[in-house]
């Protein structure tokens, strides 16, 4: 019977019958001698074996008619030289294996060492030698003995003893066999076997690839280099690095295969295609080079594994399918192999790739920044800026900033602009996270994810322009509507699942899923937003579906801090274990429960209690009429599994989509489904569906006022970007095409002129700033920053005053500092991110006492502006005059005393002394003040602004004493070579003290000693930030965040008014002087609310905001402080005038209510306004059970967790409630009464006065603690993204000091009795 190929007259194989060939040769595109290389066309080849005959196809199937390799066939006496002329399927099935010692396969290594498919004249001899070895496949499943033999066989260079005692091979002038047989064994076994052979045969290739991948990751990791300006390219950069990291991990685990490399190449090509299609930036060239470099790194191992894993059977299957498809579609009748080779891209003209290189000068895009690149693509289009948008109204406030509704001035299109405070980001080391959020929002193109159009920066804010979603968020909907109907909850949940599926496919873990971040569109559909805590991991790959991959993916990220919102945090995050995509599915389970029930399943009065319920408690289900459907209950139960391995969704989104709860849901038609709730907008600018949260966050004042302080003008490079969708919308806009892009200095000084600066000063500053920028971007600037100082012309202090281009001196991480400490690359632009630090002085510079230094006078105009309220500070006239002379070029070193206002009630108080020096002139009987009004005088008990203030350059005060230049310590490791100690400095004979830090010892030969640091000096500033009044833990934190470079300002103790004395006996009665700041403009009662909650005893309930972050160290919260450590302030906050409790100071009756700095005793003042405090430090493990204070609980609803306390003014003090003190609470039930809104649920809770606070009021004839419960809606805010504001002002009548009980808090504070106590007179 003739075969199908003979009927079609199409040869199955092309045989080489040319006269130059001694025998016919099989030509297959997959064989080593096939024309796999473009340099080989269809030309005569030399044969592989001089004795091998041609193959005659006699069976219908090509896969059964061809052996897997040139094996010896059990015919004609088992001769290895016989041709399988009579080969059949039956013979192939019953084919016996040869002896174990002969278990070799035909070798690809018979080719020359350089490659694959290279034809050489010696191939005939090599093939003859290969044929004489009677090569066979390896056994089906090798035993342990066989594996040992194979290991010896592949590793040894000696010949193996045959079973008959002979040596096999006797003559082997080439390398050994590469691979075992391709049998139908299990997939995992084949991968292990193949990688074993690969690593044994090619150890250098493996080591070379892993080494290059490590260098690749070290050089191009996103955190170690300047971020890309384009958000899409930034996200692609993240993914390329993640692919390289995953390849390195797979190689170390011996899990790489040719299929893995093939998919990796496909992913890289897709990312490169996205870069070309969705970005117009010149930075695409960087992505192209990055992809090309990674492909070169993996090319050699990929080719080797492809040769090792070549499967003829699979290839013939594909070949047969290609033949049939070609016959059906295109009617190919002749020369089928040539067609297949052409379709596979194996016969390309090699000149095709070289041809574009001839026109390189014409076709290649010019380098970024060149004049040619500016004119590329038509008229130049500048990036958007703040002036392009007009603000309509506030949408919502947040921890780091606010969201506003804006309108584009040219197109009149509405957007939502998110303004994030720069200083808050810098002080919390969150700059990189903002770039991640920008990249995700820019790259994401999904109907259920909010998209971003552009980003830019102003002097004080980073701005992201996003699409405006009109319908508010689901949290507000739950607050107003109560539990949602099942169908409505199903649709919202399903649309969120689709958004999550899209994000997870690109390796994005949201980490902060909650109803607040689910926005409702004008058509009633869901859009996911707020990626401020998100992580970018590895995108989904089919080859990662191996055994154990789920467990590895569930531990993809490991953080040293707990991030998220307490009620939605998964157990693995609480335990500080590795986490991954399953944390989002846990949050989805909590969200669905909240949708259907109306409250979260886990709650508590403290974070510890809440987390204890999360990791241990059972879920409470509603009963009776409010019972949930069984399928919904089952879905929630499976989503809230404690183990991430057992959680629904861990194996993929399809697990959730296939649940019976969505049985009747059309996943493909969700957007076409009519929503039950459609927002009804009264006007275009209607934002009534949003909660502004103005009672919790006060950003309004700071948004309106722009001051002249240089520290607020920090430029974060590469943040401004324009997405592809924005480019398409405004590509034809003349407004964006014509106007030039203002520089950062121009934007800054235009705002300065609006604030009242002179025109001449602005012009001069702009010229200086432009000159500084030009010098900074010169490629030839390869000197150290300190050595470049003299080449800049003006003095550093003048540049720091006028130029707004420089980066302020903050405590950056080590990787941020490391980039600027070493010499710059002369071939790359030099990015000067900070003012150059002067070299360590050889001789100490000691100005005359009572004189203002040049730095003090120059920086005097840089007024502190609060990031929370933005009240404007005034500038004393003498300092303004001095500033004007110095800006004009005069450097008169003569003494100059500022005119301070009299110490009356109407006089202004200087803001702080954190820049120039630390004024310690405290006199107990100085009640009227003097010409040198000190911040620590009895008129103003104010140590300094917040320890996390937005500006390290604060207002100077007149100082008597010497202030040394900054001491810059460079350390190659983590050791600076000095130790410090916290001391108490008492004010006069009172029990009020502040905490200072002195250098306790300096090691010999250490970097600190070389920099000029001396033991016994008082530390005033660390990296430009004042440490006056900071607790020891915060000072250590500032040091640890500095990396390998730290800048200290110190002064000798003998130059201050601090007198060292014996330790006090009654140290428990001491009270800390608390930090406070005064408001600049509005001093009404509502702007002077106290921001500290009250607690009755150390074990009482800790009220915190719902959003907090926990690091490795334990930070003190507002109610946990040592007797010797002041409670610290964590962020810039509105200032409050406060008075001194010194015995001689008169009582100010107009001051705010009395608030004790760390009130823990029943006798301390207790009334005041409450505001959310920050739980910045959470114990690394859950501590022992805390004793709850007696509080009456509501029986009508579930007690919400007080994790966010809005600063609503508390009612005036009144008598204790006559209601019974302790009402036993019944069994906890999560049911909420549907007819009762969240406002009603919280009604009356703010007026409960009994419990612990009530007992205090009745028993001690003291103040009254007002504890209030929180509404359910007030418990939703991010852990990490919150305004950590803590400040207090108190005014206390003269009287005996009250004791402060000790609270056990971990830390290294100076304890009572140590020789670190001092007294200030």
From Swiss-Prot:
SMART domains: PDZ, S_TKc. Disulfide bonds: none annotated. The active site is at 512 (proton acceptor). One of its GO terms (cellular component) is cytoplasm. Residues 836-847, 1199-1223 have a biased composition (Pro residues). ATP binds at residues 395-403, 418. This is Microtubule-associated serine/threonine-protein kinase 3. It comes from Mus musculus (Mouse). It is an enzyme of class 2 (transferase). PROSITE patterns: AGC_KINASE_CTER (PS51285), PDZ (PS50106), PROTEIN_KINASE_DOM (PS50011), PROTEIN_KINASE_ST (PS00108). Keywords: ATP-binding, Cytoplasm, Kinase, Magnesium, Nucleotide-binding, Phosphoprotein, Serine/threonine-protein kinase, Transferase. Belongs to the protein kinase superfamily. AGC Ser/Thr protein kinase family. Its EC number is 2.7.11.1.
